[in-house]
Amino acid sequence: MVIKAQSPAGFAEEYIIESIWNNRFPPGTILPAERELSELIGVTRTTLREVLQRLARDGWLTIQHGKPTKVNNFWETSGLNILETLARLDHESVPQLIDNLLSVRTNISTIFIRTALRQHPDKAQEVLATAHEVADHADAFADLDYNIFRGLAFASGNPIYGLILNGMKGLYTRIGRHYFANPEARSLALGFYHKLSSLCEQGAHDQVYETVRRYGHDSGEIWHRMQKNLPGDLAIQGR
């Protein structure tokens, strides 16, 4: 186990998470007692207590007052906030994780983009207009793309879609910085934003579904060609 945390709390958090991932502390089992665990990791009990509370909030653990702390099946109890952690834990599964993330984005965005363009066209156009001034480099496009999808999610009038995009932000923007280094990807994205703006202006809401699905397919093809050179820094860095 190689841990690159920058603080005692970060080290303890990574130690426990990696131990859960590697089945040293399997789901459904009980964590060692606080004193034993703090000595094992090499941190104070106060620090350990803070870490356990944070991991419980993220769904890794269940703290039971007066009872031992239970290890959860994190797939069933955690949220989108652990995406970057999963990418760091299992590099071999990163391509599949990213495919799943992008598939979810496409599936839900067919709903909220159509709703935004139909019910709140002025807000939708305001979001899409931000593409007019984007600088032609990867970082700028990564931020733009995330903010356009997020902006349209909130423009739909259902803030839950926006919260889902919030949960994807970390890994989503890291992927974007790699993906948008490709000029073809930047060109495709600009065409997509322009098409959505035109559909909004025309009131052609029935074409949104196919437009979003087509963009998901075409951008997915570019992404798959680029996966051979996937950088190792997509995962979150140690705390």
Curated annotation (Swiss-Prot):
GO terms for molecular function: DNA binding; DNA-binding transcription factor activity; fatty-acyl-CoA binding. The keyword Magnesium does not apply. Its main location: cytoplasm. Keywords: Activator, Cytoplasm, DNA-binding, Fatty acid metabolism, Lipid metabolism, Repressor, Transcription, Transcription regulation. GO terms for cellular component: cytoplasm. Residues 34-53 bind DNA. PANTHER family: FATTY ACID METABOLISM REGULATOR PROTEIN (PTHR43537:SF52), TRANSCRIPTIONAL REGULATOR, GNTR FAMILY (PTHR43537). Multifunctional regulator of fatty acid metabolism. Represses transcription of at least eight genes required for fatty acid transport and beta-oxidation including fadA, fadB, fadD, fadL and fadE. Activates transcription of at least three genes required for unsaturated fatty acid biosynthesis: fabA, fabB and iclR, the gene encoding the transcriptional regulator of the aceBAK operon encoding the glyoxylate shunt enzymes. Binding of FadR is specifically inhibited by long chain fatty acyl-CoA compounds. This is Fatty acid metabolism regulator protein. It comes from Salmonella typhimurium (strain LT2 / SGSC1412 / ATCC 700720).
